[in-house]
């Protein structure tokens, strides 16, 4: 005969898990829109992380400098441009001279 044990139902929010699709061992459960159940083992997911395909970006990514492609100008050049802009600002002289 099999023996079973009971455990209390969690009462507070702090006792509930953050994600209902994972287990403490790292197994991930998912379903497709058609209802197919997919089980990903932790070991398999860690192996996929190091595969060459995972390190290759998708082909249709938009070109966003600094996000999907390297920045167009190094930060030092951007800082130089900001310094030039501050030097070219109009001085704070009185706009109108008034005789009192």
From Swiss-Prot:
One of its GO terms (molecular function) is eukaryotic initiation factor 4E binding. InterPro entries: EIF4EBP (IPR008606). Its main location: cytoplasm. Interacts with EIF4E. Interacts with RPA2 (in unphosphorylated form via N-terminus); the interaction enhances EIF4EBP3-mediated inhibition of EIF4E-mediated mRNA nuclear export. Repressor of translation initiation that regulates EIF4E activity by preventing its assembly into the eIF4F complex: the hypophosphorylated form competes with EIF4G1/EIF4G3 and strongly binds to EIF4E, leading to repression of translation. In contrast, the hyperphosphorylated form dissociates from EIF4E, allowing interaction between EIF4G1/EIF4G3 and EIF4E, leading to initiation of translation. Inhibits EIF4E-mediated mRNA nuclear export. It comes from the Eukaryota. A motif (TOS motif) lies at residues 96-100. Phosphorylated. Expression is highest in skeletal muscle, heart, kidney, and pancreas, whereas there is very little expression in brain and thymus. Residues 81-100 are annotated as: Disordered. This is Eukaryotic translation initiation factor 4E-binding protein 3. Keywords: Cytoplasm, Nucleus, Phosphoprotein, Protein synthesis inhibitor, Translation regulation. GO terms for cellular component: cytoplasm; eukaryotic translation initiation factor 4F complex; membrane; nucleus. It is found in: Cytoplasm; Nucleus. Residues 85-100 have a biased composition (Acidic residues). GO terms for biological process: negative regulation of translational initiation. A motif (YXXXXLphi motif) lies at residues 40-46. Belongs to the eIF4E-binding protein family.
């Amino acid at each position: 005969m099999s023996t079973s044990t009971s455990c209390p139902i969690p009462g507070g929010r702090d006792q509930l898990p953050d994600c209902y699709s994972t287990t403490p061992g790292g197994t991930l459960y998912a379903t497709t829109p058609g209802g197919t159940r997919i089980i990903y083992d932790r070991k398999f997911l860690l192996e996929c992380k190091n595969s060459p395909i995972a390190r290759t970006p998708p082909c249709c990514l938009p070109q966003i400098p600094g996000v999907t492609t390297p920045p167009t100008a190094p930060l030092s050049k951007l800082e130089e441009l900001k310094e030039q802009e501050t030097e070219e600002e109009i001085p704070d002289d009185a706009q109108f001279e008034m005789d009192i």
